[in-house]
Each structure stands twice: as C-alpha cells, then as structure tokens.
Swiss-Prot record:
<dbReference type="GO" id="GO:0003735">
    <property type="term" value="F:structural constituent of ribosome"/>
</dbReference>
<dbReference type="InterPro" id="IPR036769">
    <property type="entry name" value="Ribosomal_uL11_C_sf"/>
</dbReference>
<keyword id="KW-0689">Ribosomal protein</keyword>
<dbReference type="Pfam" id="PF00298">
    <property type="entry name" value="Ribosomal_L11"/>
</dbReference>
<dbReference type="InterPro" id="IPR000911">
    <property type="entry name" value="Ribosomal_uL11"/>
</dbReference>
<dbReference type="Pfam" id="PF03946">
    <property type="entry name" value="Ribosomal_L11_N"/>
</dbReference>
<protein>
    <recommendedName>
        <fullName>Large ribosomal subunit protein uL11</fullName>
    </recommendedName>
</protein>
<keyword id="KW-0694">RNA-binding</keyword>
<comment type="similarity">
    <text>Belongs to the universal ribosomal protein uL11 family.</text>
</comment>
<keyword id="KW-0488">Methylation</keyword>
<dbReference type="InterPro" id="IPR020783">
    <property type="entry name" value="Ribosomal_uL11_C"/>
</dbReference>
<dbReference type="InterPro" id="IPR020785">
    <property type="entry name" value="Ribosomal_uL11_CS"/>
</dbReference>
<dbReference type="GO" id="GO:0070180">
    <property type="term" value="F:large ribosomal subunit rRNA binding"/>
</dbReference>
<keyword id="KW-0687">Ribonucleoprotein</keyword>
<dbReference type="InterPro" id="IPR036796">
    <property type="entry name" value="Ribosomal_uL11_N_sf"/>
</dbReference>
<dbReference type="GO" id="GO:0022625">
    <property type="term" value="C:cytosolic large ribosomal subunit"/>
</dbReference>
<comment type="subunit">
    <text>Part of the ribosomal stalk of the 50S ribosomal subunit. Interacts with L10 and the large rRNA to form the base of the stalk. L10 forms an elongated spine to which L12 dimers bind in a sequential fashion forming a multimeric L10(L12)X complex.</text>
</comment>
C-alpha cells in the first residue's frame, strides 16, 4: 500500500451543477491552495452534468503534492424547499410574513433526497429537520 498523502487544505464550496469556471468564487479559493483550477472545473462539471439547475455543495481535499479529491453533497435544503414551494426566495421576516406553503409529502421527499447528509436516524426525524428549515424561511408546512 502506498504511503498516505498529507492533507494541506479542505475547501467547501457551493457551485451550480455543471457550471464551475475559474472565475470567483472557485478560482481564488482553489488558487490559494495551488490546485489546478481547470482540472477541478472539468472534473466537477462532468460529475454534476446530470443535476444541472441545482446548487451542489462540494468538499475539496487538497494534498501537499497539489493533487486533490472532491466529494459531492446533496443540494442545500433551503434551495430544495424554494424549488418545491415555487418561490424565488424566503421571507425577510419569516415569523411574521409567510411566503409559501409546502405539504408534508414534499418535505418527506426532500428529506429522502438529503438523508445521507442529515444527522437523523430515520426519515421522520429528517423530515422534522427540513420542516424546521422551512419554518425559518417563512414557508408553512401543512
């Protein structure tokens, strides 16, 4: 087994699927760690091509020889809720002004999508986490 490479950095970014390019925020974040920016952009775009239209968080691990690996996460719950509710953004005053409604079925569907990234034992707990996110955005769950 080859010796383990030493990790020099961990970068977390949220990028539109299939649309990574060297412009900010991607370029400067990767440039600081000496990563080949175009190589990452091509690999990320290829990996997320099927999910166009979503924001896909990515965790990039940079090694001392300037190589890197990356792990894709599920889209942020807030973005999935906005899409389900059909509104462009959440409420400025979530506890006073409600902007939309989503059903429990939609919340459960989002929880299914996000299950691997959530700290929940079962789908009901995951749905409660998503419902809490909805509440803090001014979206009513029925």
């Amino acid at each position: 087994m080859p010796p383990k490479k030493k990790v020099t950095g961990l970068i977390k970014l949220q990028i539109q699927a299939g649309q990574a390019n060297p412009a900010p925020p991607v370029g400067p974040a990767l440039g600081q760690h000496g990563v080949n920016i175009m190589e990452f952009c091509k690999a990320y775009n290829a990996a997320t091509e099927s999910q166009r239209g979503n924001v896909i968080p990515v965790e990039i691990t940079v090694y001392e020889d300037r190589s890197f690996t990356f792990a894709l996460k599920t889209p942020p719950a807030a973005k999935l809720l906005l899409k389900a509710a059909g509104v462009p953004k959440g409420s400025g005053e979530p506890h006073k002004t409600k902007v939309a409604k989503v059903t429990w079925d939609q919340v459960r569907e989002i929880a299914e999508t996000k299950k691997e990234d959530l700290n929940a034992n079962d789908i009901d707990q995951a749905a409660k986490i998503i419902a809490g996110t909805a509440r803090s955005m001014g979206i009513t769950v029925e």
